[in-house]
Amino acid sequence: MYDVLIIGGGNAGISAAARLLKKGVSDVAVIEPKQVHTYKPLLSYVGAGQAPLTEAERTQRSVTPEGCVWLEDSVVSVDPAERSVRCASGMEYGYRDLVLGQGLIADEAALPGVHAALRFPDVASNYLDRAERTWRLVRDLPAHSHAVFTVPRPPVGCTGTTVKPLFLAAAHWKRTGRLPTVDITLVVDRESLLGVPDLDPRLAGHLRDLGVRVLMDTAVAALEPESKRITVTDHAGVDERIDYDMLHLVPPYRGPLWVQESGLAGEQPHGVVDIDSRTMRHRRHPEVWAAGDGAAIDTDSSGGALRKQISVLVDNLVASRSGGAMSSYDGYTVAPIAVEAHTLIAAEFDRTGALASSLPSFLDPLKPRRSAWAFDRYGLPQSYWHMILAGRL
């Protein structure tokens, strides 16, 4: 039995483990099957030819904090009543408190054939371990071709990052003289792109300037990679078949099946963990906590949001043991969207969609800036490896 058992060895799990250890919780274990830990935000730049994949990866062992046990295994079920977790190896682990940072998986029930489509050379996804292919397709796409990009319905890891590949690809095609001859289509399965009234019109303007055909409130309904074609369905139920020369696919996502089967999702759609989005504590099981993409956080997920969530989660977990006051997560998040090769909008907002900029009030918080791009490309990765995963930021 572990004092704190953490499911998921990504940003949420590792940073939570580091913070817990710093607060004196000594018996901490992380369940994570992968041997490679990836800094996912950097994959946008891998897909744009601005970063090598090796810069986004470390071994899982190297990022696991000293004093934390790494259980190299996959979770198959959780019994919150018994406080136990069963793994694919057959091992079962008990816990006093359970922290869920399991993230999301592609929802093959909502869009069949996602992983099969990735076997075709014209389909790529920065979200599904194909960022290097994204760059090859962007680099080699001929003039007079058609590129299609997709944005799924929630939940998804950082909605802003779903449109980053389009803008960075367009910047490359523009720089190499292939725009405006490359046709670009963006399929967005939601009524508004980010649901931020001040930001969405700005992004729409950038898309218009690039001549992008935007299909709002439209879902990818079927994949035909052998024919280089997708079928989309709009809000009125009207189907359209779209041929492509390049498809950047961000599929619909859901929580792992064991979340729902274990009763941890409650009434939440798509199998995300049913937590109080202010305290990060499960609504029915007080010894269960969750953060990140796979939790019902009631705001757009992002690395900036997760850093604040983990701080609140760890503080509250420790406080719950001593009867201390609980902290509250205010819903802060950030959408770092590169709209040119070397300029970026760092849009900060809260769970209501209101801007929550950390910039001085006299500066336009939605202006694309080269400094914001440089921080996103070079500063944040260093902060991630050396500060965030170490529980120091």
What is the role of each PLM region?
Residues 1-69, 153-197:
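Beta1-alpha1 glycine-rich phosphate/pyrophosphate-binding loop at the start
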Residues 68-164, 168-177, 237, 248:
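FAD-binding core/adjacent interface of flavoenzyme oxidoreductases
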Residues 68-78, 85, 93, 174-271, ...:
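A Rossmann-like FAD-binding core segment of flavoenzymes
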Residues 110, 115-143, 243-308:
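FAD-site-proximal beta/loop scaffold in flavoenzymes
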Residues 154-172, 303-312, 344-347, 351:
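Short, electropositive alpha-helical surface patch
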Residues 271-288, 339-353, 357-359:
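FAD-binding beta-loop-beta segment adjacent to the flavin cofactor pocket
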Residues 291-339:
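A conserved FAD-binding loop/helix module that cradles the flavin
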Residues 346-393:
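C-terminal auxiliary extensions adjacent to catalytic cores
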